[in-house]
Design a protein with these regions (language model features):
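Non-catalytic terminal/accessory segments
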Residues: 1-252
C-alpha cells in the first residue's frame, strides 16, 4: 500500500515541468495502467467472482483486459440486473461506464435461431480489443462458433497509420522503407492473424501495396512506376511479407 501511495503522489513531467498529482492516477505516469488494473481487480474482478457468480442461477463469465471487458450471462434478465448493479458499484468507487460502449445483446449458439423465430435480424456483433465478434458456424456449417475479424474502426486506423508513415518517409532509401513496412506488417499479422481473420489480414497487405504504389510515385516530380514495374518489378526486388494465421483460437 505504501508503494501504491507513492505512485499516486509521484506526479508527472509536462513540458519539462513537474506537476503534482491532485487526484487519482496521474495521466502520463508509467504506473497509471498498473494502478488502474489493481483498482479494477478489486472493484470488478473479485466482486464478480465472489458475489455476482454466486447469485446468478445461470452461467456467467467476465473477460477483462485493462479497462475493456465483456460479461457473458446465460439469462438475459440476470444481465440486465448486473448492468444496473455494475453502474451503482462503479459510481460508488468513482468510476463510470462508457455509454457508447455499454450494451446488452443476444449472442451465442441459440441467438440466430431465436431471433429468426421472432422475425428479427441476425444477431448483433460487438467489438473487443480490436476485433469484431460475431455469431457464425464451423466450416461444415454444422455447429455454432464464435467468429472474429478485425474491427472496421481498428482496420481504418491501422491503414491510416501506415499511410502517414509511408507518406512521411517516402524519400528514404527503398531498402529501408520496405524493411520497415515489413516490420509493421509482421506486427499486424502477429496480432490480427487469428482463426477466421485471413481475409482481413490479406486485405491489409493489399491496401499497404496500393499505399506504397501511390507514395513511391510521389518521391519526385516524374512518375516513377507503372502498375507493371511496381507489382512485377519493385515488389519482386523488395517482397512484402505474406500474411499467415499465427494463432489458432480453437485448436491447441
Amino acid at each position: 500500500l505504501e508503494i501504491i501511495e507513492k505512485f499516486l503522489k509521484a506526479g508527472v513531467m509536462e513540458n519539462g515541468k513537474y506537476l503534482d498529482s491532485e487526484r487519482g492516477t496521474p495521466q502520463g505516469n508509467g504506473a497509471s495502467p498498473i494502478l488502474a488494473n489493481i483498482y479494477l481487480h478489486y472493484v470488478l474482478d473479485n466482486w464478480f467472482d465472489v458475489i455476482v457468480k454466486r447469485q446468478c442461477k445461470g452461467e456467467c463469465y467476465l473477460i477483462r483486459y485493462c479497462d475493456d471487458f465483456v460479461c457473458c450471462f446465460q439469462n438475459q434478465y440476470e444481465a440486465e440486473i448486473f448492468k444496473q448493479r455494475l453502474e451503482e458499484r462503479f459510481a460508488k468507487y468513482g468510476l463510470e461506464l462508457a455509454g457508447e460502449k455499454t450494451k446488452i445483446l443476444e449472442f451465442g449458439r441459440f441467438a440466430r435461431h431465436n431471433r429468426k423465430a421472432r422475425g428479427e435480424r441476425k444477431p448483433d456483433t460487438f467489438d473487443f480489443l480490436g476485433f469484431t465478434f460475431y455469431c457464425g458456424m464451423d466450416g461444415k456449417r454444422e455447429f455454432f462458433r464464435c467468429r472474429v475479424k478485425t474491427s472496421k474502426k481498428k482496420f481504418r486506423s491501422k491503414i491510416k497509420a501506415m499511410k502517414e508513415w509511408i507518406k512521411a518517409h517516402r524519400a528514404m532509401p527503398l531498402e529501408l522503407i520496405f524493411k520497415t513496412v515489413n516490420a509493421k506488417l509482421r506486427g499486424h499479422y502477429q496480432y490480427y492473424g487469428v482463426t477466421d481473420n485471413t481475409r482481413e489480414v490479406k486485405n491489409f497487405l493489399v491496401q499497404t501495396k496500393w499505399l506504397l504504389y501511390k507514395w513511391m510515385n510521389r518521391r519526385s516530380q516524374k512518375r516513377s512506376y507503372t502498375l507493371d514495374t511496381f507489382f512485377n518489378g519493385l515488389l519482386r526486388t523488395f517482397p512484402l511479407l505474406e500474411p499467415s494465421i499465427k494463432v489458432s483460437l480453437f485448436y491447441r
